[in-house]
A protein has these predicted regions:
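Extended, loop-rich substrate-binding clefts of extracytoplasmic carbohydrate-active enzymes
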Residues: 1-10, 87-146
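Beta-strand-rich interaction surfaces with strong enrichment in secreted/lumenal proteins
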Residues: 139-141, 290-295
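Acidic/His-leaning functional-site neighborhoods
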Residues: 91, 96-109, 211-290
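Beta-strand-rich N-terminal accessory domains
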Residues: 1-69, 73-83, 90-93, 234-257, ...
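Active-site/ligand-binding surface loops and adjacent short beta/alpha elements
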Residues: 2, 161-165, 173-253
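Acidic, contiguous internal or C-terminal segments within carbohydrate-active enzymes
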Residues: 18, 30, 122-166, 170-172
Length: 315
């Protein structure tokens, strides 16, 4: 296998470019937010084709969603009124938490063996007590392995006595020809939907025993978010397909507890693997939020998934 890792500065951002030259797969990661800004493959004519929305474009659009694959944590989506109480300590923050706004440290890059990877890190020195009051670090690794791009979160609770509570996930948006053109194939199994009018949980849920196939929701619901718990999904592979452009992404969400589907009506779909849920209209203390993840003192917590970009026929 032949891999390469290069660095470049573009539009004020420090970028890492990791390429699998044999299989024709390339990712670009910005150290600002450790955000994937590009996932590309070489097509049959030798051209690099991007799979993310606005793939590789660092400009700010005049309107609409401006990101590519936001890293979310130490909470997901929103806090009610931008604040929460964690063991009585006030936490404040904007959408999706503070990880997206930090400059991450590249602590390891590997281009040897059968896969290549980039490992980024945030430590307690990188955030304030108002952002998160406990000493918890996170490593985020992106790996190219054969045709897939793997994502691995690894949290470590450095507190000797306190249990840590947090939520995290990734917010990748996959580009389409238009909002009308894409399809999402969902696997069979038991789902639980959480309703979130106004972006916060209402307390209403609904179970769905799905036979598998085309997403059983109207696209008109996507701007309000479709939040699903993967209760019992034997083969949790989700397929995003845009027939007009021939782009197809298979997401393997084995071990992922929740997924959020969202679009603002633009030519993309976000399929967000989540370890946790958004806040509730009737807000609970941070440590008692629904879906919160728990890390005992001195222990670790990890979560992973993979994305496989492919080219589909237009049949």
């Amino acid at each position: 296998m032949k891999f390469s890792h290069t660095e470049e500065n573009r539009d004020g951002q420090h970028l890492d470019v990791l390429t699998d030259e044999e299989n024709g797969v390339r990712i670009v990661v910005s150290r600002r937010g450790a955000e994937l800004i590009s996932i590309e493959r070489i097509n049959e004519t030798g051209n690099w084709i991007g799979f993310l929305y606005r793939d590789g474009d660092l400009s700010v659009p005049e309107q609409g969603w401006a990101n590519h694959a936001t890293v979310m944590g130490y909470y997901l989506h929103r806090l009610k009124n931008g604040r929460s109480l964690y063991r009585g300590h006030e936490i404040k923050g904007g959408n999706h938490g503070f990880l997206r706004s930090k400059t991450w440290h590249l602590v390891e890059s590997s281009t040897e063996g059968s896969g290549a990877s980039l490992k980024y890190q945030i430590t307690p020195d990188d955030f304030s007590a108002t952002e998160y009051p406990l000493k918890v670090s996170v490593d985020l690794t992106y790996q190219i392995d054969a045709d897939s791009v793997g994502v691995l979160f690894e949290f470590r609770n450095h507190e000797p006595e306190l249990t840590a509570h947090l939520s995290f996930g990734l917010h990748p948006g996959f580009g389409a020809t238009s909002f009308e053109s894409f399809h999402l194939q969902m696997p069979r199994g038991l789902y639980r939907r959480y309703f979130s009018p106004g972006n916060f949980l209402s307390g209403e849920t609904r179970e769905l025993e799905f036979r598998g196939g085309e997403m059983p929701f109207s696209k008109n619901e996507l701007p309000g978010s479709i939040i699903l718990e993967l209760v019992n999904i034997p083969r949790p592979q989700f397929s995003f397909v845009d027939p007009e452009s021939g782009r197809w992404v298979v997401m393997n969400l084995a071990g992922v507890p929740y997924v959020t589907l969202w679009s603002d009506g633009g030519p993309f779909l976000c399929i967000e693997p989540c370890w946790g849920l958004t806040d509730a209209h009737e807000q609970r203390p941070f440590e008692k939020k629904q879906g919160i993840q728990i890390i005992p003192p001195g222990c670790e917590l990890s979560g992973s998934f993979s994305m496989t970009p492919q080219f589909a026929s237009c049949d």
